[in-house]
Design a protein with these regions (language model features):
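Aromatic-lined glycan-binding groove of carbohydrate-active enzymes
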Residues: 1-27
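Residue-level marker of structural boundaries
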Residues: 19, 23, 74, 97, ...
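Extended hydrophobic/aromatic segments used for targeting, binding, or gating
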Residues: 98-119
Length: 119
């Protein structure tokens, strides 16, 4: 028994596609209203910190998020989503990323500084 992770990239927000106020034309956020909770100011602050951490460690924001999800001992499966082949490859490649204890500690600090960013 375990957890099946659904939307591990917060409807694309943890992919970095919405950074700096961007709203890609055919993105979920642009096409479907009601997902705005993932783009509130607290969430955007957290995403920016995750982006910087990913960059510092030579990975994408999506890879950081997926790799973190995959380290959780209670996760039995992680539903990845992709619109393009590049996104699919990026998500699949996250399986081979090993996060150090230091990176996991930094992820937890970001989370603790931005609790419940997408209520």
């Amino acid at each position: 028994c375990g957890l099946l992770v659904y939307y591990p990239l917060a409807t694309g927000a943890l992919s970095g596609k919405y950074r700096n106020g961007k709203m890609p034309k055919n993105s979920r956020q642009a096409l479907f209203k009601g997902w705005e909770r993932h783009l509130n100011p607290l969430a955007m602050k957290a995403y920016e910190e995750y982006y910087k951490l990913a960059k510092e460690n030579n990975m994408t924001m999506a890879q950081l998020a997926q790799a973190f999800v995959n380290t959780r001992p209670f996760v039995t499966s992680n539903i990845i989503g992709a619109t393009t082949m590049d996104q699919l490859k990026e998500n699949i490649d996250s399986v081979n990323i090993e996060l150090t204890d230091e990176i996991i500690d930094k992820i937890n600090i970001i989370h603790n500084n931005n609790p419940n960013p997408s209520p």
